[in-house]
Amino acid sequence: MSTSCSNPDDQVKARNDKFMAALNDATDIDLVMSFFSPDVSYSDFAFEAVNMDFTSTRDYMDKMFHAVDDLHLTQVSLTGDKDFTASEWVMTYKLKSSDKVGEVVKMRGVSLSWYDAQGLIVRNNDYSLKWSGDID
């Protein structure tokens, strides 16, 4: 799956690529959180986790990393500028514990992210759904 980027600013794509790589690594919570402002407001509407501050966002990400195996985010498209991006993605992972341990879950979503002058995420809204279709 190729990524389309409708933004001529390569720095925006590079910033997003680094963030996606940190999420895909799923082991270094400090690295992931280094992309967020201490004043972040983070919401993941699919899981009804809304208006989280920095500490709550960190806890949320850490729990996610510990609840799944083989987390992989694939960028589908990206548009935006230094202040705002809209990123479409596909995520796959395996559940570690539930009645469906090992089940591969596919999700498709969009992240809307706003950035401060330092390039840190100050607001992020994730919208996603479980996806049973092809990833491509």
UniProtKB/Swiss-Prot annotation:
Top-tier EC class: isomerase
Metabolic or biological pathway: Polyketide biosynthesis
Matches recorded under InterPro entries: NTF2-like_dom_sf (IPR032710), SnoaL-like (IPR037401)
Molecular function terms from GO: isomerase activity
Enzyme Commission number(s) of this protein: 5.-.-.-
Cited Pfam families: SnoaL_2
Domain of life: Eukaryota
Keyword field contains Isomerase: yes
Keyword annotations of the record: Isomerase
Family: Belongs to the aurE cyclase family.
UniProt function note: Cyclase; part of the gene cluster that mediates the biosynthesis of aurovertins, fungal polyketides that exhibit potent inhibition of adenosine triphosphate synthase.
Protein name as catalogued: Cyclase aurE
Origin species: Calcarisporium arbuscula (Dendryphion arbuscula)
Phylogenetic placement of the source organism: Eukaryota, Fungi, Dikarya, Ascomycota, Pezizomycotina
Name of the gene: aurE
